[in-house]
């Protein structure tokens, strides 16, 4: 730690692990909804599948704008206390996020319109609290380190944490829910346990991570939601990353939402979901561990594109030959191994675009950049929640009965073809239009530091003249 150059200064292992714990916690709360809420709506609340899709669409569009609000709040902060610029939002938003994550899985006996209204309101409230918590958590990376390799490692730890959270949700939620003879009670109790666990991990993150580089917003700069949009369109690398992420997150979430239906009705073994989750998430963890080394050897963009190729190949193989349990798990592992590199680097690339924006405009606005980026992610999540609900209705899905051949074929297309097509679009977008490579990034950081040193020298000279 004797090296004080921000570009080479290294973080200790404890802080990296603590940062990764944040995404364990947030994903324990988020992924129970991503994976099981649509099924809870259709099978427990008795909603038509398209009702669930509309709820996802409305609530996720709402939370896209709450992300922008979070960015506005972050960039508006002037007096930064000892807790830092971002950490207080993690501390205070984790409680309502955990509480509402549980309430979403409590069944009611109201009529369908009332059930739908309650479900929509709860989903929107969860989105608001989750935005305050998770956007602050993600936007914190530039304040933790300026070392690009350390940022890649933090992103890898974050993706590792997200993978562990997703793995636990995939492997443990249904077995926990099945312990109860009353399925509705099982959903509520399982959600409660996951929410408590998520809250604990968020607190471990809060206590273990420090903000080492807190840049206050310039006095003449006023944050606004409009500026979050402008931060995207005035920042070409960020815009390209947003478009690619729109595709990758939609593909990933569609796959997660449909896999519970696929294992139950196509493979006739819903318990296979736990085994598939165990092996495929294990492959993701291996991929995440390889991210720092592969990035160091080949660069972020090349590793990102290689991950996209693996993802697409795994889905194509599964569509044609994934009709039994063994091949489904095996080819899913290939696809999820590819997603490890893609999802890790989605986060590692965002801090680089923050620095690009500062270099281009002279204003450092982590909140606006990050929440502009997450706005696209929420739009993607809205579509990923809406499309399965609508498509389940279109293919003739009826809960808790044997499905027709047309419905089974529709499920296969939903879980494999749609994600594969979106992955290919994302790969083409990044391959042709993302130009912020490692060499250019180093030059940008060097120029930013030169500007700051020049400004400091000017201020010191002015102060000495005044005295």
Swiss-Prot record:
GO cellular component, one term: plasma membrane
Gene3D superfamilies listed in its UniProt record: MFS general substrate transporter like domains (1.20.1250.20)
Biological process, per Gene Ontology: carbohydrate transport; sodium ion transport; sulfur compound transport; transmembrane transport
Membrane topology annotation: Multi-pass membrane protein
Reported phenotype of the disruption mutant: Mutant fails to grow on sulfoquinovose as a sole carbon source.
Compartmental location: Cell inner membrane
Principal place of residence: membrane
Record bears the keyword Repeat: no
CDD domains: MFS_MelB_like
One GO MF term attached to the UniProt entry: symporter activity
Keyword Electron transport: no
Positions of transmembrane segments: 17-37, 54-74, 88-108, 121-141, 160-180, 185-205, 238-258, 275-295, 303-323, 325-345, 379-399, 414-434
Keywords: Cell inner membrane, Cell membrane, Membrane, Symport, Transmembrane, Transmembrane helix, Transport
Record-linked Pfam families: MFS_2
Function: Could be involved in sulfoquinovose import.
PANTHER family from the UniProt entry: MAJOR FACILITATOR SUPERFAMILY DOMAIN-CONTAINING PROTEIN (PTHR11328), SULFOQUINOVOSE IMPORTER-RELATED (PTHR11328:SF43)
Name of the featured protein: Putative sulfoquinovose importer
Gene source species: Escherichia coli (strain K12)
